[in-house]
C-alpha cells in the first residue's frame, strides 16, 4: 500500500484553460493578446497562421466547409445561411448592446447578430474648410445647396473639384455611392440587387432615376472627367495646392493641407442626396468577429466562457483600439468618442442615424472592371450612363454563363502538408525540376511566413479562387529554382526555412519528381518557395517564366 501525503494546506496546480483558436489573416494581434491577458489572465489564445494572398476567400471557404477556428474573423460579412449554421447568435449578450444601432443593423441576420464589427473608416467628399470660411460659404448639406454654391465658387476664380480617377474601382465606386443616395439603400433597392445578381431582373429600370443625377455631378464638375487616368497622387497634390474646394476620392486623406498639420484645414462631407434627406457616408469595416457554434457543445463549456470574455473585451474602446485598422478610425461603439472635435461627433451622429452605406460590394466582384471602365468613359464624356448600365447587364450575363470553371474535384480534404506537397509536385513538373522545397506557413512569436503554403484544400471543386488561397506565389508571380546537391537539399529539408534568422525556422515539405533519388554529391534543380539570401546565392536563384497559377491549374486539371 502506497501512502499518500496529506496536502490539505498545499495549493494544487491550476490547469490552464484550453486556448481559443483564431486565424491571423495577415493581422498582428500581439498587442491585443497582451492587453487581454492583463484583463483576463485565464484566457489563452492560439494563433493559426494565414498569411496567404487571398484571406477573404480562404476564410469564406473555411466557413463553407465548417472548419473555422473558435474565433472567426472576416473582412466581408458572409452569406446569412452560413452564419446561421456555423456561428453563435450574439444578440442576447450584454456586450452586443454596446454597439451603435447602425453598425448592428449592418450585421443583422433576421434579427440575430452572428458577427460584430471592429473599427472602420469613413469615406465621403473632402472639402477645403479654410476656403469655405474665407468666402463666408456654408458646407452644402444637399445637392440643391451644392448647385447654388458652384456658381459662387467659379465666380471667385476657384476650381470646383478634383476627382481621383486613376483606378477603375474608383469610377465604379462613385456610381454606387450616388446610387446609394437615390435607390440602392432602400428596401426595394436591396431586393433589386439580390435579384439582379441572380440574373432575375435587368439593371436599366433600377438605375433610371440615378443616371440623370450622376450626369448632373459630371456636368457641374464634381466628378471631373479631366482627371480620368491621371495618377491619384497627382490629384491629391493638386487639391492640396489650395485653389480647389472639393476632392472626390475613393479612399482616405489627411485633414490639413500639409502633412505636418499646417496650412488649410479640410473636412469630410457625405455623398449628397438631392434634398439632403438621404445623404450617405461610405463605411469600410476593418474586420468582423464571431464565435464558432461548436463552442456551445457541452465539452466546450470553459472555452465558451473564455470566448465570451474575449468578445466582451473587444467590445470596449480599449479593445477596439487594439484591433486591426488605423488608430484614427471610427469605433462602432454607441458611446464612443471617436474623435475629440465637434465635426467628427457630427459624423458619428449621422452614421448612428443610419446615413451610411458599406463599401464592400459582395457579389459584384466580376462586374467591377467592365462597369468601372464604362464609367470612366462616361465621366470623360466618351459615352453615356445608359451605355454604362448596358455594360453592367452584359457583364452580369457573361459572369453567370461562364462562372469560374473548376479545374478539378478533390475527393477528400488535404492537410497543410499535403497541400504543400501538391504545390511542390505542380511547380517541379511545370519547370522540369528534379524536386521541390515548399515552405509552410506558421506563427512564431508574431512572425509569419508569406513565402510558403498557408492554407489547406478541402473536398470538392477547385477553381482559380480556391487555388489562389494556397498558392504561395499569388496570382501572377513566377516559379523560382535553385541548384543544390542532394546533401544540401536533404539538409535544408531537415533544418527548414529560417526566414527571420532567429533559429525558429518554418518547415519545408520536400517532393521528388518521378524517378528521382537524391544522391549526396549530385546537383539537382529545385523549385523553391521560401529561401534565405544564403541559399539564393549558393543555389544561383533563377526566376522562370512559368506562373505559379498556371502551373497549379495545369497540374490539377490533369489529376484523375
Regions found by a protein language model. Give the residues of each.
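Hinge/lid segment of periplasmic solute-binding proteins
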Residues: 75-124, 138, 147, 173-174, ...
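A structural signal for short loop-to-beta-strand junctions that line the ligand-binding cleft
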Residues: 96-131, 160-165, 277-282, 354-363
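Conserved N-terminal structural module of periplasmic/extracytoplasmic solute-binding proteins
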Residues: 2-79, 86, 139, 277, ...
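Glycine-centered hinge/linker elements that transmit conformational signals in sensory
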Residues: 194-228
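C-terminal capping/gating helix-and-loop segments adjacent to ligand/active sites or protein-protein/ligand interfaces
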Residues: 28-29, 325-330, 345-398
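Catalytic centers of hydrolytic enzymes
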Residues: 401-560
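Extracytoplasmic/periplasmic solute-binding protein
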Residues: 114, 123, 147-199, 244
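Extracytoplasmic/periplasmic substrate-recognition and gating elements
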Residues: 38, 46, 135, 220, ...
Amino acid at each position: 500500500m502506497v501512502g499518500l501525503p496529506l496536502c490539505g494546506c498545499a495549493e494544487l496546480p491550476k490547469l490552464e484553460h484550453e486556448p481559443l483558436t483564431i486565424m491571423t489573416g495577415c493581422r498582428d494581434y500581439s498587442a491585443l493578446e497582451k492587453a487581454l491577458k492583463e484583463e483576463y489572465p485565464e484566457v489563452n489564445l492560439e494563433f493559426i497562421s494565414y498569411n496567404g494572398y487571398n484571406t477573404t476567400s480562404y476564410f469564406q471557404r473555411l466557413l463553407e466547409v465548417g472548419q473555422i477556428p473558435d474565433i472567426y474573423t472576416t473582412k466581408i460579412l458572409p452569406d446569412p445561411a452560413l452564419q446561421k449554421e456555423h456561428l453563435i447568435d450574439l444578440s442576447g449578450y450584454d456586450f452586443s448592446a454596446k454597439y451603435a444601432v447602425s453598425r448592428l443593423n449592418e450585421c443583422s441576420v433576421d434579427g440575430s447578430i452572428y458577427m460584430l464589427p471592429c473599427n472602420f473608416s469613413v469615406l465621403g467628399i473632402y472639402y477645403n474648410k479654410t476656403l469655405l470660411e474665407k468666402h463666408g460659404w456654408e458646407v452644402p448639406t444637399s445637392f440643391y445647396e451644392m448647385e447654388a454654391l458652384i456658381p459662387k465658387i467659379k465666380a471667385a476664380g476657384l476650381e470646383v473639384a478634383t476627382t481621383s480617377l486613376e483606378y477603375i474601382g474608383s469610377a465604379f465606386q462613385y456610381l454606387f455611392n450616388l446610387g446609394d443616395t437615390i435607390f440602392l439603400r432602400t428596401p426595394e433597392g436591396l431586393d433589386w440587387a439580390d435579384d439582379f445578381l441572380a440574373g432575375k431582373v435587368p439593371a436599366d429600370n433600377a438605375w433610371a432615376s440615378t443616371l440623370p443625377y450622376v450626369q448632373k455631378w459630371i456636368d457641374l464638375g464634381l466628378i471631373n472627367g479631366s482627371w480620368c487616368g491621371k495618377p491619384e497622387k497627382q490629384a491629391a497634390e493638386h487639391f492640396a495646392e489650395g485653389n480647389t474646394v472639393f476632392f472626390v476620392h475613393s479612399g482616405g486623406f489627411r485633414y490639413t493641407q500639409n502633412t505636418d498639420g499646417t496650412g488649410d484645414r479640410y473636412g469630410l462631407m457625405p455623398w449628397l442626396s438631392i434634398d439632403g434627406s438621404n445623404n450617405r457616408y461610405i463605411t469600410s469595416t476593418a474586420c468582423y468577429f464571431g464565435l464558432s457554434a461548436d463552442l456551445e457543445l457541452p465539452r466546450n463549456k470553459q472555452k465558451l466562457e473564455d470566448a465570451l470574455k474575449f468578445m466582451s473585451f473587444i467590445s470596449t474602446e480599449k479593445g477596439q483600439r487594439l484591433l486591426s485598422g488605423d488608430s484614427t478610425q471610427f469605433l462602432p461603439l454607441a458611446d464612443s468618442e471617436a474623435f475629440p472635435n465637434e465635426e467628427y461627433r457630427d459624423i458619428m451622429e449621422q452614421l448612428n442615424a443610419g446615413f451610411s452605406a458599406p463599401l464592400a460590394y459582395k457579389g459584384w466582384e466580376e462586374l467591377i472592371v467592365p462597369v468601372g471602365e464604362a464609367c470612366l468613359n462616361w465621366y470623360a464624356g466618351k459615352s453615356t450612363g445608359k451605355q454604362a448600365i448596358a455594360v453592367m447587364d452584359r457583364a452580369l450575363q457573361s459572369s453567370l454563363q461562364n462562372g469560374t470553371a473548376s479545374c478539378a474535384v478533390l475527393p477528400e480534404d488535404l492537410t497543410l502538408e499535403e497541400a504543400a506537397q501538391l504545390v511542390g509536385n505542380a511547380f517541379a513538373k511545370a519547370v522540369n525540376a528534379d524536386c521541390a522545397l515548399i515552405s509552410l506557413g506558421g506563427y512564431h512569436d508574431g512572425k509569419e511566413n508569406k513565402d510558403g503554403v498557408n492554407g489547406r484544400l478541402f473536398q470538392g471543386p477547385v477553381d482559380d479562387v480556391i487555388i489562389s488561397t494556397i498558392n504561395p506565389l499569388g496570382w501572377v508571380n513566377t516559379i523560382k529554382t535553385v541548384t543544390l546537391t542532394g546533401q544540401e537539399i536533404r539538409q535544408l529539408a531537415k533544418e527548414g526555412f529560417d526566414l527571420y534568422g532567429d533559429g525558429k525556422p518554418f518547415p519545408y515539405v520536400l517532393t521528388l519528381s518521378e524517378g528521382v533519388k537524391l544522391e549526396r554529391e549530385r546537383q539537382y534543380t529545385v523549385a523553391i518557395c521560401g529561401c534565405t539570401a544564403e541559399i539564393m546565392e549558393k543555389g544561383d536563384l533563377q526566376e522562370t517564366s512559368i506562373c505559379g497559377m498556371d502551373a497549379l491549374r495545369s497540374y490539377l486539371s490533369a489529376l484523375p
